[in-house]
UniProtKB/Swiss-Prot annotation:
One Pfam match: YcgL
Record InterPro entries: YcgL-like_sf, YcgL_dom
Protein name (database record): YcgL domain-containing protein VF_1703
Disulfide bonds: none
PROSITE patterns: YCGL
YcgL domain segment(s): 1-84
Length: 86
C-alpha cells in the first residue's frame, strides 16, 4: 500500500497520511482547518516498512477504515514530575 505523507503548517510534529496524493476528500473539514495547508513530505510504500514514530499496521488500518491517519507529536515530557519522583 502506497500513501502520501503531509506535514502540518499549524501544528509542529503533526503528519497526515492519505492513500492518494492530494486527495483530502476523506479528511473531515474541521481537521483540515486545524491542520492548516498540508505540505507534501513524501510518498511511501508501507509494505514491509517501519515508520519512526507510529506502528505501520495502525497506519494501514486507519487508512483502509477512515481514508486517512493523523500522527500527532508525543506529549511534552514533564521534567518537574520526573524530578519530584526522585
Amino acid at each position: 500500500m502506497f500513501c502520501s505523507i503531509y506535514k502540518s503548517t499549524k501544528k509542529q510534529g503533526a503528519y497526515l497520511y492519505i492513500e492518494k496524493k492530494d486527495d483530502f476528500a476523506p479528511v473531515p473539514q474541521e481537521l483540515m482547518a486545524m491542520f492548516g495547508t498540508p505540505t507534501m513530505v513524501m510518498v511511501v510504500n508501507l509494505e514491509g516498512r517501519k515508520l519512526a514514530s507510529v506502528d505501520v499496521e495502525k497506519v494501514k488500518a486507519a487508512i483502509k477504515e477512515n481514508g486517512f491517519f493523523l500522527q500527532l507529536p508525543p506529549p511534552p515530557e514533564n521534567l518537574l514530575e520526573k524530578y519530584k519522583k526522585r
